[in-house]
Amino acid sequence: MENLTEDMKTWFEIYMLQNRYIGHLDNDRLERWPEMFTEDCTYEIVPKENADLGLPVGIVHCTNQRMLRDRVVSLRHANIYEEHTYRHMTSGLAIVAQRDGEIDTESNYVVVQTRSNGESNVYQAGKYYDTVVRTPDGLRYKAKRVIYDTSRVQTLLATPI
C-alpha cells in the first residue's frame, strides 16, 4: 500500500505541475513559462506525421531554458500576430516509466484558441510526452515533446502549446 500511496502522490505532483504549466500559457503569464523547465531542457513541437515516420523535424525546437526565454521576449516584442487566448484541456495523464530520477509521462491535450473577434476554434489536439525531474525548486520538465495530431497549423504558432 505504501508504494501505491507514493505513486499517487507522484502522479498528483505531476498533475499540479501540468496545471501550473497550462495556467501560465492560458493566463498570459508567459514570462513564468520557462520556469517550468530545467536549464538544460528540451522543448519541441512536432507534427504527428513526422513523429510516426521517425522524422525529427518539428516546427519548434528549443534545447535549453534560455531559448524558451528568448521565445517569450520575441513574442512580446518582435513577432506580429493576431491577439488571441488559449484554453488547454488535458486528460489521460499517465506515468509510463521511472528511472534514475526521471519520470516519463504521457497525456492528451486540446487547445481552444479565441481570437480578438471573439471566435473560438479547436486550434490543436495531440499528446504531451514529458520527462519530469525533481529539483530543489520542485518538479520541472527536463523534456517536453508536443506531438500534434492536427494536419496543419491554421495560423502562426506564436504562443507555446
Curated annotation (Swiss-Prot):
Gene source species: Burkholderia cepacia
GO molecular function: anthranilate 1,2-dioxygenase (deaminating, decarboxylating) activity
Function: Oxygenase component of anthranilate dioxygenase multicomponent enzyme system which catalyzes the incorporation of both atoms of molecular oxygen into anthranilate to form catechol. Can also act on benzoate and salicylate but not on 2-chlorobenzoate or o-toluate.
Lineage of producing organism: Bacteria, Pseudomonadati, Pseudomonadota, Betaproteobacteria, Burkholderiales
Record text on subunit structure and interactions: Part of a multicomponent enzyme system composed of a reductase (AndAa), a ferredoxin (AndAb) and a two-subunit oxygenase component (AndAc and AndAd).
Protein's name in the database: Anthranilate 1,2-dioxygenase small subunit
CDD domains: ring_hydroxylating_dioxygenases_beta
Keywords: Aromatic hydrocarbons catabolism, Dioxygenase, NAD, Oxidoreductase
Gene3D superfamilies: 3.10.450.50
